[in-house]
Amino acid sequence: MADFNSPIQYLKEDSRDRTSIGSLEYDENADTMIPSFAAGLEEFEPIPDYDPTRSTSLYSQLTHNMERIAEEDDINFQHDTREFTSLVPEETDNKPEDDEESGAKPKKKKHLFPKLSSHKSK
């Protein structure tokens, strides 16, 4: 069982970056450990709730912009297929190489990684 008479101490910093020792104190009413600097927060007033009647709020502007961008991305994805067709090999790549049989010089194949192929030893 924990000894609630001795507080748990920890380091804390204030707005001026000064370090001091804070302690956690046992609150018998709440049955929880609360920081000693949190005393007096019972009167804390939260920020007022969002007013949905204001149409110029930052939230509604961001939501509208994100919806518009998502719609544009869907349109671009449906109509722009260049990145997918570039992955399909051309028909000439699938032909067997008959150049050697006809007496023509065989074509030099392009290396997949040209920068790496320029460094290979001779």
Curated annotation (Swiss-Prot):
Localization annotation: Virion
Family: Belongs to the asfivirus structural protein p14.5 family.
Disordered as annotated region, ranges: 1-27, 85-122
Record carries keyword DNA damage: no
Positions of post-translational N-acetylalanine modification: 2
Comp. bias intervals (Basic residues): 105-122
Residues in the signal sequence: none
Subunit structure: Interacts with the major capsid protein. Interacts with host IRF3; this interaction interferes with the recruitment of IRF3 to TBK1.
Species per Swiss-Prot/TrEMBL record: African swine fever virus (isolate Tick/Malawi/Lil 20-1/1983)
Record-given protein name: Structural protein p14.5
Induction info: Expressed in the late phase of the viral replicative cycle.
Membrane spanning stretches: none
Chief site of localization: virion
NAD keyword on record: no
Record lineage: Viruses, Varidnaviria, Bamfordvirae, Nucleocytoviricota, Pokkesviricetes
